[in-house]
């Protein structure tokens, strides 16, 4: 009645990149723009008109404000740019957890950045994230040069009390030539 088609897919073994790619494959190929959000994320009002204003015909991906953490008055504590608005056919999701978009297009990748769009994150603090450790280990097994997930794996070992593994992994993170983001480097030290 409202033009919505609901599809169901069970993903075993669970991986976030596989789930997102299956979801992406359900989107018609002639779709211009994909907007990927999670159930615990909410765009501020006016996001769609801002997207239509900012997006250009040759744009492949858009970075926008992401409030990962908010205080009790809904003011940002941790804010950064996130890039989960993208052209339909130019990307695939990679990494079993802390998944990211990887460009697979055949033309030049054109990324834009805007402050006109904001996505707020309202995490369910009761939700278990126990699968993250094994998924991060798998991610590093698949790509031992991925500095981002190497950092996250070291951090996850620390959260679980595996301090020697955490130290070894965070030292590996710091030794990667691609590990240049100052915030993650500082946290790994």
Report residues per predicted region.
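Catalytic-site signature of metal-activated, phosphate-bearing donor transferases
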Residues: 18-24, 42-168
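Short beta-strand-to-loop acidic/aromatic patch adjacent to the donor-nucleotide binding site
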Residues: 25-44
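Conserved Rossmann-like nucleotide-binding pocket used by diverse enzymes
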Residues: 7, 35, 62
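Flexible helix-coil transition and linker loops at the boundaries of alpha-helical arrays
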Residues: 139-144, 174-188
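TPR/TPR-like alpha-solenoid signature
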Residues: 151, 188-189
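Acidic donor-binding segment of Leloir-type glycosyltransferases
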Residues: 1-13
């Amino acid at each position: 009645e409202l033009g919505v088609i609901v599809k169901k897919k069970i993903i075993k073994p669970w991986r976030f990149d596989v789930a997102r790619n299956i979801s992406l494959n359900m989107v018609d190929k002639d779709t211009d723009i994909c907007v990927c959000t999670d159930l615990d994320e909410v765009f501020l009002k006016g996001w769609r008109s801002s997207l239509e204003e900012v997006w250009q015909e040759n744009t492949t991906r858009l970075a926008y404000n992401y409030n990962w953490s908010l205080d009790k008055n809904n003011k940002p504590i941790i804010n950064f740019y996130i890039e989960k608005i993208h052209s339909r056919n130019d990307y695939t999701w990679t990494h079993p957890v802390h998944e990211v978009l990887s460009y697979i297009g055949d033309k030049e990748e054109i990324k834009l950045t805007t402050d006109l769009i904001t996505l707020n994150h309202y995490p369910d603090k009761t939700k278990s994230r126990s699968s993250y450790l094994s998924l991060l280990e798998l991610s590093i097994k698949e790509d031992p040069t991925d500095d981002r997930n190497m950092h996250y794996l070291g951090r996850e070992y620390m959260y679980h009390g595996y301090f020697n593994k955490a130290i070894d992994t965070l030292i590996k993170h710091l030794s990667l030539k691609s590990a240049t983001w100052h915030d993650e480097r500082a946290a790994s030290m």
